[in-house]
Amino acid sequence: EEETQIYYSKLKEEYYRKFCREDEPSFHLVAGAEDFFDSLKEKKIPFTIASASIKENIDFFVESFHLDKWIDPETILYDDGTYASKIEMFEDASQVIGVPLPDCAIIEDSISGIQSAWQSGCRNIIVVDSANKRQEYEQLPGVVKVINTFEDL
């Protein structure tokens, strides 16, 4: 039962990566992301990624978007099965970059991620509004800005 579930979960993710590769017009970083990353690097502001994605997907994104230009892939946190919650992942991410969570900015795109960021102690949450829920996001604790693209930062 569990083995079958793992098999189909991995298969689903393989299909996801395949469809991403095939949809070239839509498969790209959010507008302004590269300039934003460049700016963070230039100002020596530490940052990383903490994602619920599995390692295979993280590796795929690092390779596809050349994220290693900005982020050491070894510092990226992903779902390796050891995190009981996204809160723990945020706590580890803050340790990886050496910045206490209350001093971090977390960029999120889901309500559960926003709630976890708040519960982890972050009070500077920026939301990428890919779901057209701006008004809902603006009401959530810790949300300081809702953006459509990184050009809005």
Model-inferred region functions:
Residues 38, 55, 60-153:
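Asp-based, Mg2+/Mn2+-dependent phosphohydrolase catalytic module
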Residues 51-53:
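Conserved phosphate-coupling serine/threonine residues in phosphotransfer and NTP-handling enzymes
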